Amino acid sequence: MMQFDRMALGRQAKELGFVRDTFEKVCRLADVLKFFEGDDLLSEYLALKGGTAINLTILDLPRLSVDIDLDFSKNMPREEMLEVREMLSSRISKYMEANGYRLSPKSKNHHALDSFVYEYQNAGGMKDNLKIEINYMLRCHVLPVVRRKVYLPWMTDELSVLSVDPIEIFGAKIVALLTRTATRDLYDVHNMITHELFDESQLDMLRKCVVFYSAIGGEHPPKEFAIENVGKVTKRSITTDLYPVLRHGERFELTAVQNEVRTYLSGFLNPTKEEQIFWSAFEKGIYEPQFVFEGAELQRIKEHPMALWKCRSKEQNIKTEPVKGRVR
């Protein structure tokens, strides 16, 4: 466990251009990831995703990301998963408590998700928290999970973590942008574009991931992509949600970024007829992933727990005969 000295943190944060307290949170987050990687169970069963994976393993820390979002990484029967889940929770709890964190009442445990909120007193003497979320229903992935290096300029020791594939991470990130229209999502997707992370040959798979996660992630699959929602990000949210995690002096030109992102997404987010059939069937409670994927990708997600659960729920709501998770 690294020591969090107020003066040292202040100097380092100033050198890097970040807010000290937010910088401290990322240092703590990195410490937790280091513990995960050194644990035989946590390192194999938990895959990093979301903004933290983007900014710590794909890009070179363009912004700070302050939550640890994870997927259970192995597809296994529910009973086996629950046994492993209990062991994972126990190991995380013991580590966090031994290092001065206290589990907050804001923590939640659902059948699909564990959301652990751990409170601590930061180096400035203020109360703060670190959130660790583990999704157990997203334990199937379109692409194989990969081990990636963590890029943090202040770390001397090499660190790598198990991670969801970058294409799949950004597929889910684009879905988040088009549905919750958060400033940080817009920032991350814009960085995907400006850093040219994916070439033309990868855009087809990126679109398929957006199609897939737009179906299983919401109450209803879309009929088309709501790219116009990019325009709903507000200037106020830049000040409140984005600037606190950026380097001092960095400016975010909202209108220009919105136009660039809209143009880029419009260029490849055009669902095929087959993908529209997938959406239509999913809305009726029928899981037909073969209209989106084939080969190894199809095999990996054909028994996707979240997709099957969503379809069973839809079937029950419309009082139709249940379909037992088959690929036809």
Predicted regions and their residues:
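Active-site glycine-centered loops adjacent to acidic/histidine catalytic or metal-binding residues
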Residues: 51
